[in-house]
């Protein structure tokens, strides 16, 4: 997959091109992923088209059946509030790079390694309160009853440049990719 990205204040967009195997057939993929910021809220969309020599794959844009809502929700790449470093930050959906604390146990974790064949809905949550206390949570996939990666951290910052924390990280489904 080839990815183009452009970071700016305001609307940002990334795009990718690649190939995907669906229903035993190989399709080319073109995707555009704009992020639409509305104040602290950010909505990442995943607008994609699969095509081959027979034409466009219709399954991803068919709103006529009973799965119209699921088809529409599938176009949401992520929903975010704030930015990392804010007192309250969370991102629900695709997690291309999530870090817990200083990154000793979890650094740049991604739940999109098998994307777009497997679409996970994860959570990266960070909250600071009373300027000294913090809570962090990373959950890899809400679509499964048993999570894969689950990471939590509670921190206390007694001084500006010192943070003490208690972290717990587990991969409940560690053999999944083997």
What spans do the regions from the language model cover?
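Surface-exposed loop and membrane-interface regions of Gram-negative outer-membrane beta-barrel proteins
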Residues: 41-78, 105
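Short, solvent-exposed loop/edge-beta patches enriched in aromatic
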Residues: 34-43, 83-87
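Membrane-embedded beta-strand positions in outer-membrane beta-barrel channels/transporters
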Residues: 29-33, 75-78, 122-124, 151-153
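Transmembrane beta-barrel strands of outer-membrane/channel proteins
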Residues: 15-19, 45-49, 94-96, 137-139, ...
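Gram-negative (and chloroplast) outer-membrane scaffold detector with strong preference
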Residues: 73-89
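Short glycine/proline- and aromatic-enriched beta-strand/turn motifs that initiate or cap beta-hairpins
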Residues: 6-35
